[in-house]
């Protein structure tokens, strides 16, 4: 328990009170409980300079009656917290700042890697302009840089030159040509406080010939163009003439006039368009856009120039990739490839699946823009047997539901071909043919009369003989013209009564030959005209002629 000694030690702490307060406090020992409560309220009001949290931690006086007042003790008061000096903020402003950030250079727009053609000086034309990486057909962008933390600098000079693609990034023999370019280097001056950004417009690449490589490199090194201090190389055959990098480096002078250089930065590689080893890949056309999922479909692909030993045709989806089957002999003049499609990963697909087909260079992995290709489900009837069977089966339901279920009317409507249609194309149209059309053009090659074996007439006098006498009972000759209907008399033969010869009298004029002028044979007519339009073969005409009594058999041929 706290002793009276502790109460006496705490008494000096109460010296902070006034003299009147000390006298009133000394009387509290012999006073009643009401007076102790008054003292407690007084302490709460004044607080001795302490806040409410500290008062809650101090022991509170409890009224115990007059007999126990002698044992009341007061605990030690906690020291007040140190007050914050009013000049602390002023000292914070007087603290010396740290080292200022060092200015540096960044590339905000990379040059486009592919699509730029390097041109020789002897071509006598502009080398073009390097576009930005985000350039499209609709909007063109340019390579751009930006200076950072250069607010206190008045002027900064930025230098751009060409270096190797790989380490140690030596100076490249090719040169930059265009606006603000001299000696193969582009130099621009920027004022960071005005505009810290700059875009390189009309910046092209001019290539040199192999025999000029060494001289071009030495000339640049003498001008101090070597951002990485890599020096020159004796064996210049290692220089890759088809790819370069653009190195940007900034320099400035401080207030004392000392020259400072920022760290050089490199762009992405820029490839020559005309080189097949580094050019951009592009598919122009494919002859087919779909094929079976089993693969093996032969396709023809047209593209830009590629290397036949460094190209592959890839079919892919998000979870599958297959390569086409072809050899170097299937690459035609670097612009066409004949290949066979690979089988799809799932041969039992029930619906068509669309995949991407693109070109890929094996050395650097560069790919072309993909084109769609559709895999079709497997055809279980590859030889078309089922289709042929279905094609041969009659449409029973269709025939029974029609007005002519047995096809009788359709057969009746079919016109039977006429025999003369094969010889006289104008029969149906009623055209007239002149008599000369039925006469052979060459009488030597096409004889007027044709004798068939076994149908030769008996020998008789020739018509041209002087002693020929007309005999009506003699049998007539059988010719191919007898197969045609009888023609109207073109000429009349009149036999003179007084002479022995026959006199042929021609008609007054040629009469047109028409099929309408022929009289159809009646039921009682029997002759060769009745055979026209029949379906008999030529050897059957003989039997028909002999059986009808039209012809009499002649002597057998020996």
Swiss-Prot record:
Domain RHD: 103-418
Residue numbers carrying Phosphothreonine: 84
Keyword Transcription: yes
MF annotations from Gene Ontology: DNA binding; DNA-binding transcription factor activity; identical protein binding; protein kinase binding; RNA polymerase II cis-regulatory region sequence-specific DNA binding
Region (Disordered): 1-21
Chain spans, region Leucine-zipper: 22-50
GO annotation, biological process: antigen processing and presentation; cellular response to osmotic stress; circadian regulation of gene expression; myeloid dendritic cell differentiation; negative regulation of DNA-templated transcription; negative regulation of interferon-beta production; non-canonical NF-kappaB signal transduction; T-helper 1 cell differentiation
GO cellular component: centrosome; chromatin; cytosol; nucleoplasm; nucleus; synapse; transcription repressor complex
Main location class: nucleus
Gene3D superfamilies per record: Immunoglobulins, Rel homology domain (RHD), DNA-binding domain
Record note on modification: Phosphorylation at 'Thr-103' and 'Ser-573' is followed by proteasomal degradation.
Subcellular location: Nucleus; Cytoplasm, Cytoskeleton, Microtubule organizing center, Centrosome
Ranges of compositional bias, category Basic and acidic residues: 1-11
Keywords: Activator, Biological rhythms, Cytoplasm, Cytoskeleton, Nucleus, Phosphoprotein, Repressor, Transcription, Transcription regulation
Residue list for modification Phosphoserine: 19, 552
CDD domains associated with the record: IPT_NFkappaB, RHD-n_RelB
Organism superkingdom: Eukaryota
Sequence motif: Nuclear localization signal, positions: 387-391, 411-416
Tissue: Expressed in intestine, thymus and spleen. Undetectable in liver, bome marrow, kidney and testis.
Quaternary structure and partners: Component of the NF-kappa-B RelB-p50 complex. Component of the NF-kappa-B RelB-p52 complex. Self-associates; the interaction seems to be transient and may prevent degradation allowing for heterodimer formation p50 or p52. Interacts with NFKB1/p50, NFKB2/p52 and NFKB2/p100. Interacts with NFKBID. Interacts with BMAL1 and the interaction is enhanced in the presence of CLOCK.
Function: NF-kappa-B is a pleiotropic transcription factor which is present in almost all cell types and is involved in many biological processed such as inflammation, immunity, differentiation, cell growth, tumorigenesis and apoptosis. NF-kappa-B is a homo- or heterodimeric complex formed by the Rel-like domain-containing proteins RELA/p65, RELB, NFKB1/p105, NFKB1/p50, REL and NFKB2/p52. The dimers bind at kappa-B sites in the DNA of their target genes and the individual dimers have distinct preferences for different kappa-B sites that they can bind with distinguishable affinity and specificity.
Entry's free-text remark on domains: Both N- and C-terminal domains are required for transcriptional activation.
Protein name as catalogued: Transcription factor RelB
Organism placement in taxonomy: Eukaryota, Metazoa, Chordata, Craniata, Vertebrata
């Amino acid at each position: 328990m706290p002793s009276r000694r502790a109460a006496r030690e705490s008494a000096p702490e109460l010296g902070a009170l006034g003299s009147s307060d000390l006298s009133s406090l000394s009387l509290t020992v012999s006073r009643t409980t009401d007076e102790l409560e008054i003292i407690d309220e007084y302490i709460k009001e004044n607080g001795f300079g302490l806040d409410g949290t500290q008062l809650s931690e101090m022991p509170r006086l409890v009224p115990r009656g007059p007999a126990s007042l002698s044992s009341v003790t007061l605990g030690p008061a906690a020291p007040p917290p140190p007050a914050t000096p009013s000049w602390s903020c002023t000292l914070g402003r007087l603290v010396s700042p740290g080292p200022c950030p060092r200015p540096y250079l960044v590339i905000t727009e990379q040059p486009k890697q592919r699509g730029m053609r390097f041109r020789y000086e002897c071509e006598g034309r502009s080398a073009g302009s390097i576009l930005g990486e985000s350039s499209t057909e609709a909007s063109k962008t340019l390579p751009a840089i930006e200076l950072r933390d250069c607010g206190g600098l008045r002027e900064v000079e930025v230098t751009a030159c060409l270096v190797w693609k790989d380490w140690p990034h030596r100076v490249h023999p090719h040169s930059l040509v265009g606006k603000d370019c001299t000696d193969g280097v582009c130099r621009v001056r920027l004022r960071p406080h005005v505009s810290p950004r700059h875009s390189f417009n009309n910046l092209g690449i001019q290539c040199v010939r192999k025999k000029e490589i060494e001289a071009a490199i030495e000339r640049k090194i003498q001008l101090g163009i070597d951002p990485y201090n890599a020096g020159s190389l004796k064996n210049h055959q290692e220089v890759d003439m088809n790819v370069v990098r653009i190195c940007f480096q900034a320099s400035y002078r401080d207030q004392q006039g000392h020259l400072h250089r920022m760290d050089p930065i490199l762009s992405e590689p820029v490839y020559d368009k005309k080189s097949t080893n580094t050019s951009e890949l592009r598919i122009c056309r494919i002859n087919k856009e779909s094929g079976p999922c089993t693969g093996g479909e032969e396709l023809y692909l047209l593209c830009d120039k590629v290397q036949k030993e460094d190209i592959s045709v890839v079919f892919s989806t998000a979870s599958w990739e297959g390569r086409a089957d072809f050899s170097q002999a299937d690459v035609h003049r670097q612009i066409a490839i004949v290949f066979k499609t690979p089988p799809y990963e799932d041969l039992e697909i029930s619906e068509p699946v669309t995949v991407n087909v693109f070109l890929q260079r094996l050395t650097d992995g560069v790919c072309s823009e993909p084109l769609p290709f559709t895999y079709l489900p497997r055809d279980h009837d590859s030889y078309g047997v089922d289709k042929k069977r279905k094609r041969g089966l009659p449409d029973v339901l269709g025939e029974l539901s029609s007005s002519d279920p047995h096809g009788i009317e359709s057969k009746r409507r079919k016109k039977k071909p006429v025999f003369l249609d094969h010889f006289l194309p104008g029969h149906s149209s009623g055209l007239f043919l002149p008599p000369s059309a039925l006469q052979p053009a060459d009488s030597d090659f096409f004889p007027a009369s044709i004798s068939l074996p076994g149908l030769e007439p008996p020998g008789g006098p020739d018509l041209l003989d002087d002693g020929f006498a007309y005999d009506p009972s003699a049998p007539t000759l059988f010719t191919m013209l007898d197969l045609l209907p009888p023609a109207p008399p073109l000429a009349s033969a009149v036999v003179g009564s007084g002479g022995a010869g026959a006199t042929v009298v021609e008609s007054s004029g040629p009469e047109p030959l028409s099929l309408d002028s022929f009289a159809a044979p009646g039921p009682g007519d029997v002759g060769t005209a009745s055979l026209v339009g029949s379906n008999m073969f030529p050897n059957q005409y003989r039997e028909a002629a002999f059986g009808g009594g039209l012809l009499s058999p002649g002597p057998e041929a020996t």
